[in-house]
Amino acid sequence: MSALANHSFVKMNGIGNEIVVLDLRDVKHVVTPDEARAVAARVPYDQLMVLQPPRLDGTEAFIRIYNNDGSESGACGNGMRCVVRQVFEKTGQASATFETRAGLLNCWQGPAPDLYTVDMGVPKFGWQEIPLAEEFRDTRYIELQIGPIDAPILHSPSVVNMGNPHAVFWVDGDVNSYDLERFGPLLENHPIFPERANITLAHIVDRDHITMRTWERGAGLTKACGSAACATAVAAARLKRANRIVQMTLPGGELTIEWRERDDHVLMTGTATFEFEGRFEPQLFASVA
């Protein structure tokens, strides 16, 4: 029987990003891809955030992040805010450090009671760090397009690694006017991205405001992607088209992103909403090896 049988979970969302938080700090078990997919079939989610016992002194937990296709991700900003809210409400803490595959994340209570800030770390721009399948000296724009050569629908994205690979396509109009559900999977799995990529359409309203929409690697079309918001804000600032503190409008809500000048860390601030608490039925994992 799966170690997840009869285990409790919490369903939350980070501005529309559907999140399941599973605290396994008292259980020595690593969730398998089959188990992650079984959970998604019963409790639909974009990301499954699994708290495991801390591996490093001074950290609250080691966080494994699963997409709904069973693959693992290095970062999920919206999911981290949900984890932070759960931990803070249980312990009364106002700050904590978590370890993820992408590194250490410092988190704290935001400027209002319903806001939480996650330090998403330092963005990476080198073509091998993103990674890309071929060399590009300047990743502010790379050669990639969808549509006819002489009239591409989308072209020349900026690429950033924000704990996972991101490609940001800049558009002049409404981000909802593009068929991201059609283009997203093609671009996510393009050969230029050996580890696949998150695909974002972004419109710069002004230097303090960007609207965006994301096809999330391993999860599909989503109402929100925190790491994509960070990547988009950083990419816009690299192009000198936006300030280092910017308001991001996503289909699910608003995030404030700051690319801190003194150390290049990216800070993401937003809400985390509780939906319900439940317990996994044993039969959910009956077909899981």
Swiss-Prot record:
Gene3D superfamilies, per database record: Diaminopimelate Epimerase, Chain A, domain 1
Enzyme class: isomerase
Catalytic activities: (2S,6S)-2,6-diaminopimelate = meso-2,6-diaminopimelate
Positions bearing the site annotation: Could be important to modulate the pK values of the two catalytic cysteine residues: H166, E216
GO molecular function: diaminopimelate epimerase activity
Predominant place of localization: cytoplasm
Active site: C76 (proton donor), C225 (proton acceptor)
Localization, UniProt: Cytoplasm
Superkingdom of source: Bacteria
Role according to the record: Catalyzes the stereoinversion of LL-2,6-diaminopimelate (L,L-DAP) to meso-diaminopimelate (meso-DAP), a precursor of L-lysine and an essential component of the bacterial peptidoglycan.
Protein name (record): Diaminopimelate epimerase
Organism: Bradyrhizobium sp. (strain BTAi1 / ATCC BAA-1182)
Lineage start: Bacteria, Pseudomonadati, Pseudomonadota, Alphaproteobacteria, Hyphomicrobiales
